Amino acid sequence: MLRPYQQNAVDAAKAFLSKCYDSCIIDAATGAGKSHIIAELAQWIHETSNKRVLCLAPSKELVEQNHGKYIAAGGMASLYSASTGQKSLEHYVVFGTPGTVKNSLERFKNFAAVIVDEAHGITPTIKFIIDDLRAKNPQLRVLGLSATPYRLGSGYIYQLDENDRAISEHETTDPYFKKLVFKIGAKELIDQGYLTPPTTEHHDGYDTTGLELNSMGKFDARQVEKAFEGEGRKTAAIIAEVVELSAGRKGVMIFSATVPHAKEVMQSLPRGNSALVTGETPKAEREQILKAFKARKIKYLVNVSVLTTGFDAS
């Protein structure tokens, strides 16, 4: 059963998609359960159109997560992603990664809709897929979901907000989606008891005064290295405090600045109860580590720019 706000999001999307062919987007904060919203809408679109539905996500983990929620809700769906080892179109609802789908578009026919998870990261590949499927079906519906429907440098990714206010040229450049149909933020979810209020701790260990954002809105890699790497004693003191403060917690995720910094962090964590995932971690090992963390077989999971988007640790 959907939570009330999830049902409201579904209803808003249904109302919009039922009356026009324009694209729309749902803005739901991290932790809102977008996978459940996707599952409900994919099932509804298939049942009302008797056609296929394609659900895209940027990573293997997200594709499997969304697929799993759909199956758990009682539906039947296929996986189409090389990284999962499956390229199936057996069922009407298909969960896939953009790269794998693009390479096999001749197989993708009779689709009623494309649902894009993490839609703020919409790429030329995703647009190419949508254009191809729309050429095959001019009535194709397109729906996006994101916790941050905004791109640095180009602004909001929709033309109209939930109140039909046109987003000005100062706030957006060439937005892909026509309308924001539903929005719920983290504060609302906390106030309603669906998210745990965040608590913060401050440690004076690292000197980050030299860190500055570049033109892409990111920190310079060399400045990050200078601030965080080679500070073994400071790192050890910070991690000791993390271990102490998390004594009653079942799982702890730690986000490190660089791979050398992550290795310093690992040196201060309990051996046998912690693991590290980076972009270089082999797929099989990475999958094994994530399964162990979700199963509470390890408590501390350190990562470097890997588990930053849509990861569900439950």
Residue ranges of model-derived segments:
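Conserved pre-motif I regulatory segment
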Residues: M1-D27
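Conserved interdomain linker/interface between the two RecA-like ATPase lobes of SF2 helicase motors
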Residues: P175-M253
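Conserved Walker A/P-loop ATP-binding site and its immediately adjacent core
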Residues: H36-I37, H46-A72, A257-P260
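Inter-Walker segment of RecA-like/P-loop motor cores
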Residues: Y70-E106
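Post-DEXD/H (motif II) to motif III coupling segment of the RecA-like Helicase ATP-binding lobe
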Residues: G121-P198
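Walker A/P-loop
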Residues: K19-A42, F255, V302
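Conserved helicase ATPase core of P-loop NTP-dependent helicases/translocases
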Residues: E64, L79-L89, M253, A262-V265, ...
